[in-house]
Amino acid sequence: MGYVDYFLIVWDFINYARTHGIPVGPGRGSAAGSLVSYTTGITNIDPIKYNLLFERFLNPERVTMPDIDIDFCYERRSEVIDYVVKKYGKDCVSQIVTFGTLAAKGVIRDVGRVMDLPYSFCDTIAKMIPNELNITIEKALQMNPELRGMYESDENVRTLIDMSKRLEGLPRHTSMHAAGVVISQKAMDEYVPLSRASDGTITTQFIMTTIEELGLLKMDFLGLRTLTVIKDAADLVYKNHGIKIDVNHIDYNDHTDPDAVLIDYNDKKVLDYIGTGRTEGVFQLESAGMKNFMKELKPQSLEDVIAGISLYRPGPMDFIPKYIKGKNERDSITYECKELEPILEPTYGCIVYQEQVMQIVQELAGYTMGQADNIRRAMSKKKQYVIDAERQNFVYGNEEQGIKGCIANGISEQAANKIYDSMVDFAKYAFNKSHAAAYAVVSYQTAYFKYYYPVEFMAALMTS
């Protein structure tokens, strides 16, 4: 696919971070499904061991730029960006602009100020907008009868709201993308217009999607505070107990430090501890709801933690009782056809991951993995016309596209349609297993330190 240079660039700055003691996450997003990422040390997750799919990362039938997001220690992320600037030249590296927009409450206050209306009046109207994500003024008028009444009876309110609705959603100000960095072969200003932020940082004047459309190389350097906590906890353990703990060991490599202790990801004591729900401070597992879920789940493997992180989200949460019942009562699990069993057995008969949708259409209907990723994408983005067309292909096949179809594989029409319906329902919310696996490793690492070295872990957590 011609991405050798891309992987080498990513490997280079990750290698710089590791060799300079800057904590790097085990992986993030679909890149953890790449064996090349694993063997080069870009990620620490073995995709074969956890059955992660490469085509979820790069699809040979829908060629796009790879997207490897990397988590670094929150406090030292800037050092990695500085290294990239020095290596490739300040003229060839830039951060990316973002545009803040006039949202419902903000636009009312801004328009009111321009109209010279009293601040208290505008603030009262703005506070009547419900605190809902992506709320619009029009939706607020439908949801709040009091606001609707004022709009219909007060000319000042009506003028303010009508003008605000016309401006709602327009760009208000610029800021810098929290993670995006662009690297170019020639001077950046030969490709895109640039600007200088208030702190002197050079940024593109094009947003991230435009940068990607132009074919420029975009990387995401993210800061994850938990990595700092883990590093500080490991340092305190060595200082207090003389024990070195290697959290970044990759299985296929020779262990370079014979004195270091490796974390056992099948440690029953750590898994049982997670199952007690005493996971305050444990990455991804510290909310009240997640603690209760862990008490019900009682994970027995890292796979259970991966599934837990994937399920505890709006939508998939409805399947938690079925998942737990299947885990505890294996005899209660049923499959529409025998071909589903090896795919869904690890998740007790439930579709939990996007990768499982891909495996189902490949194994049952004969899609290629590239075609399977395309249908997974269509389902997650709710492209109904694609979903309807693919149902025909899934059930009956499509000779022109090389799809055999379920019926040709001995699966009944009724069962095939039922399986397809369940995929459509769940694919809207299904989680990327590669990302869940990487973050489950971080969750487990924090639980490991909290269980075995609670003093050092809590000191690191409070310091951060």
Question: PLM ranges: what are they?
Answer:
Residues 1-464:
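Alpha-helical scaffold/interaction cores of sigma-54-like transcription cofactors
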